């Protein structure tokens, strides 16, 4: 299992390096500003917040780089803002994942999908374009939506960027992982 963890960490580092390269290449998009849309319409229960936690699979205490949203297999995972798909495919710990560049150094990542519904180069619309179907691929203990916000290639807590009338459920919003039924 340690070799698998090392491989997942290597793949994670590759994704981050690719994101930084794409950011440096200046993809021709412009961030339209404002808040990001809630990425899983109809599902607001956060099962794990951004921050330090004990990983439910590896048992390692480390940064959880996004938020996990409890949702059933096959639920729609939508673009949080207008942008261009810069990565769509399988990536180790993330499983099936999509990265969207919104311009201005802002990117969002959607992971653990059962089905990818966009391709690299596709233009997506805020709240309208389905980028993934919720699933449990990669390092996952159950169906859920893992959502990240990256500013200039660095992950940050997504919640301050999300407001469109959705107030996430307060269930299990501590930074320590206590419910491992649907987490990365």
Task: Give, region by region, the residue ranges found by the protein language model.
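Catalytic cores of peptidoglycan-degrading enzymes
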Residues: 34-180, 184
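Alpha-helical oligomerization segments with coiled-coil/rod-like character
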Residues: 1-34
């Amino acid at each position: 299992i340690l070799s698998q963890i090392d491989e997942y960490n290597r793949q994670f580092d590759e994704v981050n390096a690719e994101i930084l390269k794409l950011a440096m290449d200046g993809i021709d998009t412009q961030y339209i500003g404002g808040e990001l849309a809630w990425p899983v319409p109809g599902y607001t229960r956060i099962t794990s917040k951004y921050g330090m936690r004990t990983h439910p699979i590896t048992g390692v205490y480390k940064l959880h780089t996004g938020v996990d949203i409890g949702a059933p297999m096959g639920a729609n995972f939508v673009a949080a803002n207008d942008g261009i798909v810069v990565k769509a495919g399988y990536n180790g710990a993330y499983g099936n994942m999509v990265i969207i560049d919104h311009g201005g150094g802002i990117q969002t990542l959607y992971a653990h999908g059962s089905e990818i519904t966009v391709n690299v180069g596709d233009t997506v619309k805020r709240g309208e374009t389905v980028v993934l179907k919720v699933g449990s691929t990669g390092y996952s203990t159950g169906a859920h939506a893992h959502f990240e916000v990256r500013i200039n290639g660095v992950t940050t807590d997504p919640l301050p960027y999300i407001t469109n009338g959705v107030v996430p459920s307060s269930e299990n919003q501590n930074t320590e992982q206590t419910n491992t039924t649907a987490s990365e």
